[in-house]
């Protein structure tokens, strides 16, 4: 149960290594419920932040490769922007090529940073589709300046300790972002 002053230091949901960025949202009770679901181990898909020196580390999981990449993107964006009231106003299509799945994860996250830096937009959702010679990524974006900033904005994707693999419970990834 959240108490009156818990919005200042909200309780840490079970299953999360660090408090979810969404806990700083305007409605702490709803944010807490969404955060627990996003980071609850055993759910079919989700994401969470984990402690990592001065950088941002995101873990994500889903039944499919594309779902795992989607969760990694949402985890990244939610680490620095409150998406609770966000809705898509633009669609951006990018064709990306990668030799391996972890290269694709890096390429998608680099595109997220590029969109933010060049046009000031951030994804609120995305869809991936395999095509001849690559992957089409459709980003549903919104103007980042209309959202509340809740953390440091990532500047680059680090290749250090990058993990992306399929196991018997689906796909998992862990990626570090320089902030």
UniProtKB/Swiss-Prot annotation:
Ca(2+) binds at residues 55, 178-179. GO terms for biological process: tRNA processing. InterPro entries: Archease_dom, Archease_dom_sf. SUPFAM superfamilies: MTH1598-like. Coiled coil: none annotated. Keywords: Calcium, Metal-binding, tRNA processing. Induction: A member of the dormancy regulon. Induced in response to reduced oxygen tension (hypoxia) and low levels of nitric oxide (NO). GO terms for molecular function: metal ion binding. It holds the Pfam family Archease. Belongs to the archease family. Activates the tRNA-splicing ligase complex by facilitating the enzymatic turnover of catalytic subunit RtcB. Acts by promoting the guanylylation of RtcB, a key intermediate step in tRNA ligation. Can also alter the NTP specificity of RtcB such that ATP, dGTP or ITP is used efficiently. This is Probable protein archease. It comes from Mycobacterium tuberculosis (strain CDC 1551 / Oshkosh).
């Amino acid at each position: 149960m959240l108490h009156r002053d818990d919005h200042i230091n909200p309780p840490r949901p079970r299953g999360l290594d660090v408090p979810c960025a969404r806990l700083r949202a305007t409605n702490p009770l709803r944010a807490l419920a969404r955060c627990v679901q996003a980071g609850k181990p055993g759910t079919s898909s989700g994401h969470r932040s984990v402690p990592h020196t001065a950088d941002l580390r995101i873990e994500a999981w889903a039944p499919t490769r594309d779902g795992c990449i989607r969760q990694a993107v949402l985890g990244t964006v939610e680490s620095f922007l409150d998406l609770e009231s966000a809705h898509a106003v633009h669609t951006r299509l990018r064709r990306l090529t990668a030799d391996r799945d972890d290269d694709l994860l890096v390429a998608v996250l680099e595109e997220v940073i590029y969109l933010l830096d060049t046009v000031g937009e951030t994804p609120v959702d995305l869809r991936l589709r395999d095509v001849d010679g690559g992957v089409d990524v459709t980003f549903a974006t919104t103007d980042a300046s209309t959202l509340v900033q809740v953390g440091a904005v990532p500047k680059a994707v680090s290749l250090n300790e990058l993990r992306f693999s399929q196991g018997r419970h689906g796909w998992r990834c862990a990626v570090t972002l320089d902030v």
